[in-house]
Structures are given as C-alpha cells and as structure tokens.
Amino acid sequence: LKPPDRKSSSDSPDTEISPVLLFQTLQGFLPEFIQRMLVVASENATLTKSSFPQKLEDADHSERVVEFATPSYLEALLEQNSYAKYDAILFCPDTERPFDFVPYVHIISKALTPQGWIFWVTRSEPCSADLLDRLNDVNMELYVIWDAMPSSLVASPQPFSWVRRTRQDEIKGDPVLFHCLAFVPKNYDPLAHARALLLDGAPGPAFNVLTFVPEVYLENPPVRAAVKAEQALCLLAWDQAASDGLTLPRFHLAQAFFAQATAADPHCHLAYCVQAEFWHRLGDDYMAARTLRSIQHVAPQETTATQLNTYTSHPAVPTKPWEPPEWNEGTSLPRILLITDNRPNYGLDVLYAGLFRVLGADHVLEFPHKPTLHGGQPERFADYPCCFCLPGEAVTLEQVCDELRSGRFDLLLFGDVERTLEREQALQVVRAADRIPVFLLDMLDDFRDNRPEVCDWLQLKHFAGYFKREMLTCVSYGNGVFPLPFAYPEERMPTSFPEDRPYLLFWAGQRQFGIRKLALEYLERRFNVDFSTRYTQAEYVSILQSSHIGLDFSGFGFDTVRYWEVPAHGAMLLAERRPTCIPFDFTDGESAVFFDDIPDLEKKLLYYGTHKEETIAIAHRGYDHVKRYHTATLRAKHLLGWIAQTMR
C-alpha cells in the first residue's frame, strides 16, 4: 500500500533545541515496539542514557536497550562485523549548526531490523527532493511527520509540543520550530507488524503500531476496515491476558473500532468475530451468536461458522426485574437543579421537559442555561426532536451557588457526564451542594460504569444514585443503579393518522453502527429498495406517518430515538432486539416486533409485509404503549419514583 508522493513546506524559526528536552518530549509518541534503539547526536550535545524517557526501560513485556553514538563514530560502529540490529535509529539536531541526515541514510538502513524505523529531528524542509531520492535508493520512505509547535500555540508546560500531521502534505499556517520525521522500509506493513507483535504476546505494542498508520492509507476502505478490526483484536487479546476487571471499558473502545471497520467494509469478518467474542467474555453468548449469524447470512465464511458453533443461544436475563416505583406527589414537590451540557442532548433535554411538566417552573432549573430548551434553535442536531419552548431565564454560576447554599434545592442531578462544563465551575456547584444528595444522570452512548471517573472529577466520594441509559442486561452494575432509557415528547405524538399508509417500510438515518450497513445493503439487494434518500424534518415525519412499518437498528448506543419515535407516530416498530435494560419494554409480537439478526429480519419482513391487518394492530398497541409508559412526563415520574425510594 503506497501513498502518493507528496511535498510540503513549512517555516522553521531558528530556535535552539536541547537534546535532553527533546528526549523528554519524544516520549509522548515513540512507538512502544522499540526494544533496541540507537541515538545519534552531535559531538557538542550533552547526552546520557538517563536523559531518555524511562518508559522505554520500564515496559512490562521486555527490557529496552538504548545506545548512543556521534556522527563521526557512527560509520565505524556500523562497520563492525557483528552487532545487534536496531528497532529504531534516532538522529538528533546539533544545537549550533544544521544536522545533515542525508549522508547517513545509505549506512544506517542496513542496521535496522526488517520492521525498523528511522527518526530524524530537523529544522529543514520535511519533504525535500534530495532526501526522498536518497531514501528511495535504500528502499525507505517517509511515514509520519510531527511538528514542534511553540507553547504559545499549544498548551504545554514545555517550550514546545509535538503535533502529528494528519497528512504529510499538510501545510501549517502557524510557525513550526522544527520537525520529527519517521521513515520506514518501503515494504513495511503495519498490519503484519502488529500481528507479529500480537502473536508474540504483546497486544499493547501491537495496538500502538496501528495508531501510527497514516490517514492516506486509511482512505482505502478495505485497509481502514482491516486496521480498525485489528485494533479491536488487540484489545481482545489484551483483555484475555488481563485479570483487572476492565473488560467493559475495553469492549466500549472495541465497539468504536467495530463501527469504523464495518462502516468501511461491512463484510469484514474479523470485526464481527472480535465483537462476538467480547460479548462472550461479558457472559452474553446470545448476543455473540446474533452478531455472527448476521454476517454469516450475508457473506458466509468457514472460520466464522466454527466460532459461531461455540456459542449457546439463550437470551441474557436481567439481574433483576426493573419496574420503577410509582411516584406520588405528596404535599411537597422536590426542587431539582440539573447540571446539563452545552449542546442538544436528546436524553437530558427530553427528561428536563418531563420534569418541567411534572414539577413546574419553580421546581426545576438547568445550569448552564440551554437556549434550545427555551425556544432557541441549535446549530447542530437540529433534526433531533429535543427542542422546546419552555419558560426560563439564564442564571449565573454565582446565583446557582448562592441558591444551593440557601437551601432552595433538594437534590442535584449531574448530567454533564462528558464534562463540557469547566471543572472549576463544576466543583463550585458541587461544593455549594454539600448538604443535598447528588445523583448521576448518564445519557451517553456508553455502557461503562462512569461513576468512578466522574466522582474523581467532581471530588466526590459517591453518588446518591446512578441513572443510566445504556445498562446492559448481562452486566451487574451494583447497587444504586437504575435504567433510564430515552422517552418521547408527548406533544410531538400525532393524535390522528392518515387513513391510507401508502408505504410499507420506512428507514432513514446513518448506516455507520452495528449491523446497520450490512443489513441495509442486504435488504436493498434482496427487496430492490433504496434507503439512501435524505429528508427534511417535515418530510421525515410525513413519510413515517405514511408507512406501515418503521425499521430500527441499534446505534453506537443501543437505545435510539427511533425506537420510540416509530410507534409514537403510529407505525409498527420492527426493531433489533436490545441487550439493555428497558423498564416496561414493548412486548414482541404484541406492541412491537423484534428481530435478532439479519435472517430473522428478512423472515419477519416477508411475513408482516403480507399481513397488513396484524401490522396495523401491533402499530396501534405500540402507540398506546408509548403513551402509557414512555412519554417525557412518564419518564420523569420514573426518575422521581426511584429518587424518592432512594431517599427514604
């Protein structure tokens, strides 16, 4: 895989470089696979092994060796009859005059291992024709470029900070102090390198190698899929070798790579196989088998079939039934402060609207002020049905803290799990709320337990309770954790429906996550349909209300807006069965229809496409079910019921 020849230019101010400081800053990006390294520095440089980053010698899987040489000694060193080859050779700049790397290219390439890298720190033009020609003569090529940016441009305690270029031909508009260039053999294959490290029992360095793959390589979809799937495989191998209880965080990261791999190539079997094995490690063989049955139905492979046969197919049972206690208003209503984020957030915003309706304007306040809750229009996410016209004025941080200290609020809901609020502001709010319970409200696309990280950020010992949208049925999250999926704003639910629904099946949306792309492309071929049409929000609602069946897949978060939106608009929900806890969920075949995998989806489409009366009846019951259990107001009452139970 060869990127096109590219050239770039950059201004390099004449800034003195300390080799010791250089070494200290290099530790942020040197590849972890390096076991033996030669450092070449000028005669005038004060350089010792102790200057080099300790991480090269403290890695778990092997000892690192760092050797030093001056340019005048280099050729003699490499002409010795026997010496161990190096994983990397680093050329440092002279502090007094330009260091010419080019004359040494012909002698150092033979001192490298087959996967070895050369690093060169220079103020010179990164892609000069002379350099590229000399590299070509010894079968080396430019791989990665880092630019040293002044600390005035990049927040750093050092005088400069390294910034990796997204592309080799990227032109920096800001001044660049100097560059670090990485060169590799022309036949260098990062996937083969990573797999060799993985088979050698080093999943961390294997994963690290893949983080350096240049973006230009990843523009090829099959290559991107292979790299992302291999990164997920490294995480799986890492998890299999560990016993630290961190399977859930690793799976969360692996799921992101699964989404990227299958978006680039929906037939990438390795991505599905790794995803399935992570489900198995969490104790959910049912999800593991479902994942593999989908890819096997579309593009069967023998090795995938072998893995599929190792899984049992029994659905995971929730650790306990989830039915929120009924909330009774009583004589006094709780006064709630909700700490929210600074952009439209469907889960938080719909819940706020529900709390507003249940408690009234005097009993619920958001901070910071979010205009989209009060008639403002967002620049992004405008198509999500979570904009409201509720009364409310902006308040300052000082006002919020004063009201907390004066006892205006009975509890605090912290919903900014992404921590968009400045930390010092968040700490001021939490300190002012030291006499009331603090609950964590986690509406992210994230099935990890985020309590420890947010507790640490807020300097809290614990939360009074944890409300979580993405709560896997196969995982025990401990006490004080309650499932709180999305809901649907009741004012957006139509009260009448068209007599004629001319469309059988509706889908519109992103294809990136889960089995979406695999399934949609299969259905388009199988039924000669097209799901690529894009709609305005008004067109979207109109066509959804004119369709008998609304199709829904899990996203990066398993809970989706469409899961509630489809039945709320009177269409039959045909949805991928969720692996998450959903109180008062739809009943399969009664108020919705669930499918486990692509063959199951195909079978149910064929059936309900020819049984319109059943489809209509299920759609009506689904609409009634949303109105009975899953409106914004009802979700707010579920939350309040659990809070009341917790605070007794």
What are these language model-derived features?
Residues 115-123:
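Conserved beta-strand signature within the Rossmann-like core of class I S-adenosyl-L-methionine
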